[in-house]
Amino acid sequence: MVQKTSAWWHRPLGFVGLLVSLWLTSGCGLNRVAANRIIAAPNLQQHRMFAAWDSVWTNLLAKVTTNQPVSVMIPVGPPEASLSIMEIVPRDYHTKFVTTVTHRPDGGGSLALNWEPEPRNTFQPRGRPATIVVLHGYGMMKEAMAPWGFLLAQAGFRVLSIDLRGHGRSTGARIGFGKYETADLSQALDQLKARGLCDEQVGLLGLSYGATLALNWAARDPRVRTVVAIAPYNQPEEAIRRFADMAGGRVPTRILRGGAAAAAAKLELNWKDWSGEAGLRQLQCPVLLIGGAKDPICQPADIEALQKAAGGETKTLVLPEANHYVVGVSFKELTEPITDWFRERL
């Protein structure tokens, strides 16, 4: 049986949609209110969205395998939080994923993700399976990266998909755009290794927000041997503005800038210290940067700037027709180059 879900683009996303509503309904203190929204845990703001995604991905897991992946909760902090982490063990799940994209004349469109049975034996066992940690985008959850988890597991890797703090089933009242998350992930790796759930060294696959976090985590933890970053934003402040533009541009620039500045003050950080470039300048492990030529968030110029900032081996791959929604589910185009990259470096 084919299982399918669909998504539309050209509509407000994540905290941008919340900022839009704030702009339309509030008359004062917008910088402060916007800052609080920017750093607040998405799973505390978007209950309905997470419930809908949870239903979709739970259904996917049930169709792909009768042996449900094991999830554990790992305490991290400060600030105090617990991360929900799902293990997908290497074996043949007899599954393939097909993405169908439909474009509208107004520049919008839709995509449908199909999960289909694969009767062929596609499992590629390895001697001792290397571990790949998978990180989702802003406002998503670990189950949203399950297709990549199953594809990598079929390629012989052990996969750990993580709900970042404030996402999915993880806890934490605030997100830190890397300041909290890089420490969280290092602590989680310590505890996962102690439980026998991962190797000393790992590879990372990140999407969007998770891709930039992966670059900054790798820069701070020598146990990361390689990174595949799909559609990483470069400068956080610029990414916030671009998300607003993609949502319709209804939030004035001054509010976005003021909110971002106030958020940085609340987090006691400099946005530039947590950019994609900042991470790449510090890390030496091999990095595969993947973007879409039509992505307004991670633009081709950003991929070029990230490559120039890299201190070690770096390769880029840009899909000519992909936008920010499509690039992360371009399984036909990306499965082989991503699995080959990890095989050669783990």
Give the positions of each predicted feature.
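An N-terminal hydrophobic leader/cap segment in hydrolases
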Residues: C28-T122
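The serine-hydrolase catalytic nucleophile loop
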Residues: Y138-F150
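Conserved alpha/beta-hydrolase
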Residues: L152-T171
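Alpha/beta-hydrolase active-site loop
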Residues: I175-G196
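Hydrolase active-site cap/lid region
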Residues: N216-L269
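Short beta-strand/loop motif that positions the catalytic acidic residue
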Residues: L283, L289-G291, D295
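Acidic catalytic loop of the alpha/beta-hydrolase fold
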Residues: K294-C298, Y325
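Catalytic histidine-centered segment of alpha/beta-hydrolase-like enzymes
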Residues: A322-K332
